[in-house]
UniProtKB/Swiss-Prot annotation:
GO terms for cellular component: Golgi apparatus; Golgi membrane. It comes from Candida albicans (strain SC5314 / ATCC MYA-2876). PANTHER family: ALPHA-1,3-MANNOSYLTRANSFERASE MNN1-RELATED. Its main location: Golgi. The gene is MNN1. It is found in: Golgi apparatus membrane. This is Putative alpha-1,3-mannosyltransferase MNN1.
């Protein structure tokens, strides 16, 4: 009997074991069939495959440009189905009362997946912020278990009729192409049919690729925005309070829409969310957001930069400036600085929670060390007390560091003679007789080389260095400046600007040169911004007129001058992260010059319009051209005033007078080392007080002398103002023959009478001549201001 019982138990165990094994095998087989195809490389160490721990450096082959979607209308060409839902339209009416999407409302394809499987009222009416985040990324994985952002992606629009993609497209779209051509061919001669048909095929294929690439970029940008808000800044109290209030109000609105006038639900109560099989299986695979972070930011190595103080002491994490600088009140940070590291948190969240203090940031290489010395001297003359972080990428040697530290810490009490005229402006404590004279500077060197994954260090060369400096400096609030930026106000002045304190940013505009771009660029940038469903799901606002009415969106080529940028990183980290990401997306960077526009466009694309531009476009600063030097042919003088200078300057929009900063150093011509002085002396069209090559050489190497500033006017419609009086038609003229092509002339007014005084205008009553004169801003500085500019110029150049 006992033996029989034992055999029965053994048989039962065997049956249970066999059944459990088969069940596990079934689950694994189901997961494999859902998430991998025959080309997938299955990893035994992580469901994130090669992208999490850098076991493999190459990406999987890109998918074909064509897909089965060619057989049906693309999601780019039609509104996503859920947007036609009555509830969605009702929420749109409520949420977007004062703004509308001006361009096609492109959204991430992930939303289409979500709302094809779940009711709108369930997602928007029942889910918390965290639940929405998790649902979105469950669907990212369900769509592609190996999803990652590849900074090397090429959006290649090169046309080749011999490619398989093109041939497949023509085959699938043959009837559509023929139908379209039949409507057009009456415009052409019969012998031109083949050529015109080929052009049509190329045009339609190019449009297809454009739409495909745009959708791919939108998918990525949406994922960046959502990941950052969900997992990087989700511990910030202002965000928590705002998103909780947003969702509470939204869910109440959904509930109200779902009820009839008596307060009863129309059909039934709102269903709770039930995950699909794919979404449920993702639960078995998703681990920490810190792991997924590497898929979003593969170029970040998750190593802190090395922070080296001028004393030689090295910190391997962001330094606590309040403690290091003897409890300097300017370095006190309201938030609690996180000292320890938590491996379960994303690296960027840990880094964020260590930001502290306020300071100046610049990025240099060895070739910039002389400029850096001049800048340090200037900051001492301005009595700067803020720490300075010089961010570099392993390309600043010890000799350059010694030069900069010497400039920052050496005894500096021998001042140029021009100081005598401004000494009364600074007070008795300006020169410390017991110390080192002018205020020594707290200089730090920040080596961010190891913070960038080795595969992507070349992605941030040249202008990109500034973008990384914005991220890897350790300040909560920072002023980012170029090494050739010349401050005319103490750095603390900029942090006290009202609009900076309100918004956490302060940006400056470029020269308002009437160089134009297509308005389609602006529409493209708007399409790259948040969609209406981004705002509805995650409270990430769409672009408004605050952004889309700016001159760049209306066709101006250049808008922002990035020689000085003010950002509160505690408020705007997600926008800084977006700036660094769009720097890696060719179709975006291809529409701008360098880093300039990426700062504010990064904010707008991130759904962050809490940025502020000074009202004034850049000015020309220097001395007025004598009116007789530019007289008309008849000897009369122009109404407009002119300044020709290689230096853009920035006049405060608060008072239309104060000079805040200038660019391109303080020598008259920062390209003097490259100038052919004999050639420029022979031109005799500008700088007519100079006659010989030696005079040009002396003038170019000496400090710029500033008596006036001109902010040229800009026509509202970005048009030239033609006139009959030889007045300038636009505010800027490029004088390429001087200062190695860096000279620009600015005019205090544009336009003028449409007829000369001796010409009768029969089209106007009383012989009043039409006049389209538009005035800008002409600033004349007083003797104290001029003396201060002279002193700062002498300090920068090193005049004794």
């Amino acid at each position: 009997m006992i033996q029989k019982l034992i055999k029965n138990r053994q048989r039962s165990k065997w049956v249970l074991f066999t059944g459990a094994s088969l069940w596990i095998f079934f689950i694994l087989d189901f997961m494999n069939s859902n998430y991998y195809n025959t080309e997938s490389h299955i990893s035994s160490y992580s469901i994130y495959n090669v992208y999490d721990n850098l076991h493999e450096e190459t990406e999987s082959p890109p998918k074909s440009a064509l897909s089965s979607s060619l057989l049906e209308p693309s999601t780019n060409q039609q509104t996503s189905d859920f947007k036609n839902h009555l509830l969605y339209k009702s929420l749109i009416s409520s949420l977007f009362q004062n703004t509308t999407k001006q361009t096609k409302d492109l959204n991430s394809n992930i939303y289409d997946d979500i709302f094809s499987n779940h009711k709108l009222e369930t997602v928007l009416g029942t889910l918390s912020f965290k639940e929405r985040c998790d649902l979105y990324f469950k669907n990212v994985f369900a769509e592609d278990v190996n999803w990652h952002f590849n900074p090397d992606t090429r959006y290649d629009m090169h046309f080749d009729k011999n490619t398989k993609e093109f041939k497949d497209f023509i085959k699938v779209k043959e009837l559509v192409i023929q139908e379209k051509f039949d409507k057009m061919k009456e415009k052409f001669k019969e012998e031109d049919y083949n050529r015109e048909l080929s052009k049509l095929k190329k045009s339609m294929f190019t449009d297809f690729l454009n739409e495909k690439f745009e959708q791919e970029i939108v998918n990525r940008l949406s994922t960046f925005r959502i990941f950052n808000k969900c997992y990087i800044t989700n511990d910030e109290t202002p965000q928590i309070n705002k998103i909780n209030q947003f969702i509470t109000n939204q869910q109440k609105l959904v509930q109200d829409i779902h009820r009839d006038e008596s307060g009863n639900f129309y059909k039934s109560k709102i269903d709770k969310l039930k995950l699909t099989n794919k979404e449920a299986l993702v639960d078995l695979m998703v681990t920490k957001s810190s792991t997924f972070e590497h898929r979003v930011y593969p170029w970040i190595s998750k190593e802190y930069p090395v922070y080296e103080r001028w004393t030689g002491k090295v910190y391997h994490e962001p330094p606590n400036y309040y403690e290091i600088l003897n409890h300097d009140p300017m370095q006190k940070t309201p938030k609690k600085i996180q000292q320890s590291n938590n491996a379960a948190q994303p690296f960027l969240k840990q880094f964020k929670n260590k930001f502290n203090g306020r300071g100046i940031v610049l990025t240099i290489g060895n070739q910039h060390s002389d400029y850096a010395v001049s800048l340090i001297h200037l900051l001492r003359a301005l009595d700067n007390k803020l720490p300075i972080q010089i961010v570099y990428y392993d390309d600043v040697n010890e000799e350059s560091k010694r030069k900069i530290v010497t400039a920052a810490q050496e005894d500096f009490r021998s001042l140029p003679h021009s100081f005598e005229k401004v000494a009364h402006l600074f007070g008795d404590k300006y020169i410390n007789s017991q110390g080192k004279g002018l205020q020594p500077q707290e200089v730090w060197f920040v080596n961010a080389y190891n913070s960038i994954h080795k595969n992507y260090r070349g992605k941030f060369s040249r202008f990109g260095n500034k973008l990384l400096a914005s991220l890897f400096n350790s300040f909560s609030e920072f002023m980012l400046i170029d090494v050739d930026t010349v401050l005319m106000q103490p750095p603390e002045y900029f942090f006290q600007l009202k609009n900076y304190q309100t918004t956490g940013t302060y940006f400056f505009k470029d020269r308002s040169v009437l160089q134009r771009r297509t308005v389609e660029d602006g529409k493209f940038f708007e399409r790259m911004g948040p969609s209406t469903v981004d705002q509805m799901m995650f409270d990430i606002p769409i672009m408004t007129n605050y952004t889309t009415t700016r001159e760049l969106f209306r066709g101006l080529q250049h808008y922002m001058e990035s020689g000085l940028v003010m950002i509160n990183k505690d408020k705007h980290l997600n926008s800084i992260l977006m700036i660094t990401q769009i720097n890696l997306i060719g179709p975006i960077t291809g529409k701008v010059w360098g880093d300039k526009e990426l700062f504010w466009l990064g904010f707008a694309i991130n759904g962050d319009e809490e940025y502020y531009f000074d009202d004034n476009f850049a000015a020309a600063i220097g001395e007025l051209t004598p009116p007789q030097d530019r007289a008309r042919k008849d000897g009369t003088w122009h109404h407009s005033k002119e300044i020709c200078s290689p230096h853009p300057g920035h006049v405060s929009g608060d008072d239309n007078h104060s000079l805040l900063w200038i660019n391109s150093g303080f020598r008259f011509c920062h390209q003097a080392d490259e100038v052919n002085f004999e050639k420029e002396a022979k031109k005799k069209t500008r700088l007519k007080h100079l006659h010989t090559a030696d005079q040009f050489r002396t003038f170019y190497y000496n400090p710029l002398r500033i008596t006036h500033a001109v902010v040229p006017p800009l026509d509202q419609d970005l048009q030239d103002r033609k006139n009959a009086m030889d007045e300038p038609t636009s505010g800027w003229l490029w004088e390429s023959g001087y200062c190695k092509r860096y000279m620009w002339c600015a005019y205090s007014s544009v336009g003028g009478p449409q007829k000369r005084p001796d010409e009768k205008d029969d089209t106007v009553d009383n012989n009043e001549t039409k006049d389209n004169t538009l005035d800008g801003i002409l600033v004349e500085y007083n003797q104290d201001e001029i003396a201060l500019f002279n002193y700062l110029g002498d300090i920068w150049v090193g005049t004794e």
